[in-house]
A protein has these predicted regions:
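Structure-specific nucleic-acid interaction/processing domains
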Residues: 1-117
């Protein structure tokens, strides 16, 4: 991975109140910012570019952003956070995630490539 191993990150879980299984339900992510800041970014993307194929966007639309719970799972090095994320999301499209843990989605990679090529 190409991350600064010294940088601190948060492994977080976005889920509904009734969700009990972090391995199969909700969204697991990594951020080097506060969870509330990262959550606002997710909400902004949802509000500005709704994607009907994005499970997190579908959850926001179906359940309402106000019903999503933000849970901090771990504060650790960024490398450790991505390794843990991969344990919770080893495959694409698990829970509300589109990419396997520790990796960018193909859509994100294509956007980055288009900006720099």
């Amino acid at each position: 991975m190409l991350h600064n191993p010294e940088k601190v990150a948060i492994l977080y879980w976005l889920h509904l109140k009734e969700h009990t299984d972090v391995f199969t339900q909700g969204y697991v992510g990594v951020s080097t910012r506060l969870i509330d800041v990262r959550f606002r970014e997710h909400c902004s993307r949802f509000n500005n570019s709704y994607n009907q194929y994005n499970p997190l966007h579908l959850a926001f639309a179906q359940y309402g952003v106000e019903n999503i719970i933000k849970t901090r799972l771990c504060v650790c090095s960024i490398d450790q956070a991505y390794r843990l994320e991969n344990i919770f999301r080893p495959f694409e499209y698990m829970g509300w995630n589109t990419a396997e843990g520790g990796k960018l989605s193909k859509t994100a990679i294509n956007i980055i490539k288009s900006k720099y090529t």
